[in-house]
Design a protein with these regions (language model features):
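A conserved mid-protein helix/loop that constitutes part of the nucleotide-sugar donor-binding site
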Residues: 1-13
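Nucleotide-activated donor-binding/catalytic signature segment of Leloir-type glycosyltransferases, i.e.
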Residues: 34-58, 69
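Short alpha-helical donor nucleotide-sugar binding micro-motif in glycosyltransferases
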Residues: 62-67
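Aromatic "clamp/platform" in nucleotide-sugar-dependent glycosyltransferases that forms part
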Residues: 75
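Short hydrophobic beta-strand element within catalytic cores of glycosyltransferases
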Residues: 92-95, 99-102
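A short, well-ordered alpha-helix in the C-terminal region of glycosyltransferases
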Residues: 134, 141-156
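C-terminal alpha-helical cap of glycosyltransferases
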Residues: 134, 138, 156-202
Length: 202
């Protein structure tokens, strides 16, 4: 579902020999190895650089500061943690148009490079390549400005904002409850809930 080979194949199809794809977080040097990535390394020695989980923090930090863009390629992302990390680090993002990442950056779509996910993988490679070319054709200063603006997409996920949103949920629930129950019944239900919670803790 992650489709990590998508950027590699797109770069190869572009015929750009000066571009490398870094895959960070692949732990393929364990006891059992990782046949998929070992094969990928053999197939794409010029395009692919693998940064395993076992890398030290300095190495990871170096590559995060060296990459031109982060490619979000999964077809199933319930909540895009990688998307959030990318935005937080102010790294230009090449992102798919699926729920999860799309919902996170929907207010800053003009500041990311979106590509359409197609059921046909060959077309998917082509769509991704088009997004990569748009990234390459964008001036580095504009990329930096876009990445800075894209980070504002995280404002709605900050703890203080989420806390206020939960307050609204509880307040609205109480208002609806007041329309169905008397005040004494609501208080009774609150006390019962607190009592049940106390028994569970005990």
């Amino acid at each position: 579902r992650k489709r990590p080979d998508l950027p590699i194949l797109a770069v190869e199809r572009s015929n750009r020999n000066d571009v490398r794809v870094f895959n960070m977080g692949v732990d393929y040097r364990g006891e059992t190895g990782n046949p998929f990535w070992e094969e990928m390394g053999r197939k794409h020695p010029k395009q692919l650089v693998i940064i395993p989980f076992s890398s030290n923090k300095e190495t990871v930090h170096f590559y995060w500061n060296s990459v031109g863009a982060n490619c979000i390629t999964g077809v199933y992302e319930p909540f895009g943690y990688t998307m959030c990390e990318t935005l937080d680090r102010r790294v230009p993002a090449i992102v798919q148009d699926i729920d999860g990442p799309k919902e996170i950056c929907e207010l800053v779509m003009d500041s990311v490079f979106e590509y359409h996910v197609d059921k046909d993988f060959e077309q998917d490679i082509e769509n991704f390549k088009e997004a990569v070319v748009r990234f390459w054709d964008t001036h580095p200063d504009d990329r930096a400005s876009m990445a800075n603006h894209a980070r504002t997409a995280l404002d709605g996920f900050r703890p203080e904002v989420i806390k206020e949103e939960w307050k609204k949920v509880f307040s609205n629930s109480e208002i609806r409850a007041k329309g169905q129950y008397s005040l004494s019944e609501i208080e009774k239900r609150k006390k019962q809930a607190q009592q049940d919670k106390g028994e569970q803790l005990y």
